[in-house]
């Protein structure tokens, strides 16, 4: 149920107007981007979410709602309400573990997602890379960073192998191990893009696990594993730049030291992978 309003409302007003019988249960963090809180009534639970990035355009939050509205409940939470600065979605019962599931199981989830109808908007990385450069701390901008940005701008993004709907933030903390199978939460970066971009972006533990995930996916998708792995590797510089830039952007936004540490680590990885 989308509800349009130009005037933001506070949490208590949201609950009293739309969920008068529900009460807050707990607040929990959801990855590095921010948090949500849980409401409950007679055993029924919803997650109340706000935009993770307060500076992001409202259209980005609306796109997340639209993505969830068209995805099957077998892989994503169903949304129940959208209005400015708020979204209410189903709570997915299950375990959120600190490690990825079996690569074959994860490949099955991603392949099923990629068979769904496209969302209708493309993921383009270059505008994000340039935004993060512009919005980062000037003292953190280096000649090397600018050089890599110019190099990618000149090279252009890899041509998609297959264009599909993507989640684009697959890591252990965004995977719910439910009784009916794996499901994904936190769809804020979702959009249409190359399947190899999704596979390249998965937060794996090591190269061996990454190769196995790609091989398992290739089997399902009937693609030569070596061909898919080459395409995944083409995206690596783009994704490392995206991660480093996002950490820099969030550092300036929040002042949280964890983002500086993560940015520095990603810059080191980028130099290694060049």
Curated annotation (Swiss-Prot):
Entry's Gene Ontology molecular function annotations:
ATP binding; thiamine kinase activity
Query: Biological process GO terms, please?
Result: thiamine diphosphate biosynthetic process; thiamine metabolic process
Write down the EC number.
2.7.1.89
Q: In which pathway does it act?
A: Cofactor biosynthesis; thiamine diphosphate biosynthesis; thiamine phosphate from thiamine: step 1/1
- Please name the NCBIfam families in this protein's record: PRK10271.1 (NF007620), ycfN_thiK (TIGR02721)
User: What does the UniProt function comment say about this protein?
Assistant: Catalyzes the ATP-dependent phosphorylation of thiamine to thiamine phosphate. Is involved in thiamine salvage.
Q: Protein name, please?
A: Thiamine kinase
Organism from which the protein derives: Escherichia coli O139:H28 (strain E24377A / ETEC)
């Amino acid at each position: 149920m989308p509800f349009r309003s130009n005037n933001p409302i506070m949490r208590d007003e949201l609950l009293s107007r739309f969920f008068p019988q529900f009460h807050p249960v707990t607040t929990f963090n959801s990855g590095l981007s921010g948090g949500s809180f849980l409401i409950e009534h007679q055993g029924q639970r919803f997650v109340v979410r706000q935009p993770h990035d307060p500076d992001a355009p409202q259209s980005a939050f609306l796109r997340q709602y639209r993505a969830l509205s068209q995805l099957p409940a077998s892989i994503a939470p169903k949304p129940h309400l959208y209005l400015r600065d708020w979204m209410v979605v189903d709570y997915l019962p299950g375990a959120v573990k600190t490690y990825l599931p079996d690569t074959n199981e994860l490949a099955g989830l991603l392949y099923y997602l990629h068979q769904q109808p496209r969302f209708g908007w493309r993921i383009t990385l270059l505008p994000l890379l340039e935004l993060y450069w512009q919005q980062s701390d000037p003292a953190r901008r280096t000649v090397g960073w600018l050089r890599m940005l110019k190099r990618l701008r000149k090279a252009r993004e890899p041509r998609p192998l297959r264009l599909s709907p993507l989640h684009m933030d697959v890591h252990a903390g965004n995977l719910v191990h439910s009784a009916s199978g794996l499901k994904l939460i936190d769809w804020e970066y979702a959009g249409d893009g190359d399947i190899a971009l999704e596979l390249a972006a998965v937060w794996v533990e090591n190269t061996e696990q990454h190769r196995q995930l790609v091989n398992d996916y290739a089997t399902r998708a009937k693609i030569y594993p070596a061909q898919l792995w080459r395409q995944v590797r083409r995206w690596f510089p783009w994704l490392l730049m995206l991660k480093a830039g996002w950490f820099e952007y969030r550092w300036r936004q929040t002042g949280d030291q964890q983002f500086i540490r993560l940015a520095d680590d990603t810059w080191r990885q980028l130099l290694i992978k060049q």
